[in-house]
Each structure stands twice: as structure tokens, then as C-alpha cells.
Amino acid sequence: MNKKSIRDVDLKGKRVFCRVDFNVPMKEGKITDETRIRAALPTIQYLVEQGAKVILASHLGRPKGQAVEELRLTPVAARLGELLGKDVKKADEAFGPVAQEMVAAMNEGDVLVLENVRFYAGEEKNDAELAKEFAALADIFVNDAFGAAHRAHASTAGIADYLPAVSGLLMEKELEVLGKALSNPERPFTAIIGGAKVKDKIGVIRHLLDKVDNLIIGGGLAYTFVKALGHEIGLSLCEDDKIELAKEFMQLAKEKGVNFYMPVDVVITEEFSETATTKIVGIDSIPSNWEGVDIGPKTREIYADVIKNSKLVVWNGPMGVFEMTPFAEGTKAVGQALADAEGTYSVIGGGDSAAAVEKFGMADKMSHISTGGGASLEFMEGKELPGVVCLNDK
């Protein structure tokens, strides 16, 4: 990675404005999944050990530019204190006199959590005045919020106009892993693309066709490809306006020598429920009033075999409606194949794929789980991320 990280700068006694991603799911004031808080710990601990004054900023939910009581970061600050085993202070604003006073009172190694940055309308507009206010609190800007790196906001990008800007350890690792996958992959390199909609994955498929040896397609978006081949798909998800594009992608794969894998059999159902009756049929045998909801057992075997023989696998998007037990087996099988594969480096591209490997208890068997759904998707599309571009070069 050619961007400076916290390892490249002197931090002792410095006030560090560290943008983290503490956008955790909450229920009735309780944190239901603290993965993102834990992911930021190595950076925070490093800053503390180096004698920095650690000022943490994050968004939580979508308060739309005003203070929303249940979206305050107070419970997050409390939990962070427990995880760090030290006192963590919490400011009720993200800039201004109160925040400035609290920062002025900090000693080396102290940790302060600012209020939800999205309580201010200027945050999502990348307002220069707000960015200046944030910058006034600190000597150095650290961006460790990979999950928000695709956003050009005041606390993720704008602030870098006014302070030296470096990455945190989590951001550094994300950029290293994803960057190596796209620029210098070990081969065979396989991408598994799933999820509901072709339109969400157009950029990724287009970009990866130039990079991969194998492209595996699953999830709801597969049926647009199946229909493009002339098969009947019943009531399965389909984007008719993307059929020509699907044909184009399959043709491109052929021209570029990429092995293009699609389901050969599918799980079908007449109703969406936990107790649904399902059948397994060949891809050319979906009845008119049934819909495909998962990849079938033959497909799972083929996909598992490709995974086993790959050196690098990037997975973005589930194979079926994994949230419901009867339609979860395909996604589980892909996860299991990755967990069992020896000598295969597995990169899980955030979002639903990350949720799936968590749900099936396979997370610790994956080489790297990205903390950014949208950000990793845009990175894999070959786009520049504003929260990365703004960092100082080495």
C-alpha cells in the first residue's frame, strides 16, 4: 500500500482524530453485534500505546443531520471501555467548546468518543466548515473506517484537507488484502458473485472478468443469466432489462478465457417461508409457478470443487435466501468449501456474505472478512475510494 499508516508517523503527545466505523446494529439501546468495535481495537490500542490522545469519531445509523437520542454513541463508548479495560470518556457533541474542553483535559493514552458525526447536516455533504471544526480538535487525522471509505464525507475525507492524514491498521489491512487480490493475485483466482440483483454487481463482474480465472454465479442474479441462455425460470427473480448484458458478460468470459460457472440445478419453492416445501430440479426444468431460491446439490459440488482447486477466492453475495433455513444450504455449502479448502486464501467481501459466514459459525475459518460491504464492492469495481485517496502518500 502506498499510503502512510499510523506506523509511519510520530504519535506521542499528539491529538489524533481517528475516524472509526462504529455503525453497529442496536436494539433498545443494546448493541446486538459488536464486530465493528472489535475490528477497530488494534488501531485504538496502538494509538494508546504510542502515547497519543485518542479522539474517536463515527456515525451510527441515519439520523439525517439532526440529533436522535437512540442514535447517540453512549452505549458504544461504554462497551469500548469494557473491551479496552480502561476509562473511555464520551462527549455529547462532535465539535465545539465542550468537545474542545474535553480534548484539552486529555492526557497521553486517554480515549474520548465524540458524538455521532451524522447529527450534523454538513457531515454527509462533506462541508468544509464542519471538516475544519473537526480538524481544530486534533494534530493528525487517522482514517480507520474502511466501511465508510467510499463516502466523501467531512469526517472521512474533508478533514484531510486540514491535517496530516494516515490510515489506521484496519484500513491498511483491507487495502493490502483487496489490493493484492486485484493487482497481483495468486492463481487460480476465483470470484464468487451472488446476491439478488445483477444491477448491483455489474461493475464488479465487468472489472473481475479481466482478473479472474473462474467466475462463479449464484443467488437471485443468476436467473437473469439462466434466462439469457434461453431457459424458462418460472417466477424466479429476473431483470429483463439486463438480459442482453448477461449475454455480453458470458461472451466476454469466453473471449477472455475465463471459466464461467452457473447453476446446473436449483432449489425451488412455491412460497417464501421457514416451512416452505422445496424441490430440486435441473436448471432447464423450473415450472412456471415456482421460483428458484438456492443453488442445488450438484451445483454445490461443482462450486466446491472449483473452490478447492483455487489459490485465491473472493466471495461477494450469497447463493440463495440464506436467512431462511430451507433456502440456506447453497450459501452454507460455499462457506463450508472455503472453510475446508487448504492453501486457499479466502476474502469475504463484507455485507451479506460476511453475515452468512458469521451465522454459520465459519468466520474464524476465513482468511479475511472485509468490514465494508459497499466499500469493498466499489474497490472491486476498480473505483477510487474518497476516504483512501485523501490520505498522504508514503
Curated annotation (Swiss-Prot):
What keywords would UniProt list here? ATP-binding, Cytoplasm, Glycolysis, Kinase, Nucleotide-binding, Phosphoprotein, Transferase
Question: Sorted alphabetically, which Pfam families does this protein's record hold?
Answer: PGK
Q: Tell whether Kinase is among the UniProt keywords.
A: yes
Q: What class of enzyme is it?
A: transferase
Superkingdom, according to UniProt?
Bacteria
Q: Establish whether keyword Ribonucleoprotein is in the entry.
A: no
Q: Which residues bind ATP?
A: 201, 292, 323, 350-353
Signal sequence segment: none
- Name one cellular component (GO) term: cytosol
Q: Name one GO molecular function term.
A: phosphoglycerate kinase activity
Phosphoserine occurs at which residues? 183
The Enzyme Commission number assigned here is 2.7.2.3
Q: Which reaction does it catalyse?
A: (2R)-3-phosphoglycerate + ATP = (2R)-3-phospho-glyceroyl phosphate + ADP
Q: Where is it localised?
A: Cytoplasm
Q: In which pathway does it act?
A: Carbohydrate degradation; glycolysis; pyruvate from D-glyceraldehyde 3-phosphate: step 2/5
Chief subcellular location: cytoplasm
PTM sites of type Phosphothreonine? 299
* Annotated substrate binding sites: 21-23, 36, 59-62, 118, 151
Name its GO BP terms in alphabetical order: gluconeogenesis; glycolytic process
Assembly description: Monomer.
**Of which family is this protein a member?**
Belongs to the phosphoglycerate kinase family.
Name under which the protein is recorded: Phosphoglycerate kinase
**Per the UniProt entry, what species is this protein from, by scientific name?**
Bacillus thuringiensis (strain Al Hakam)
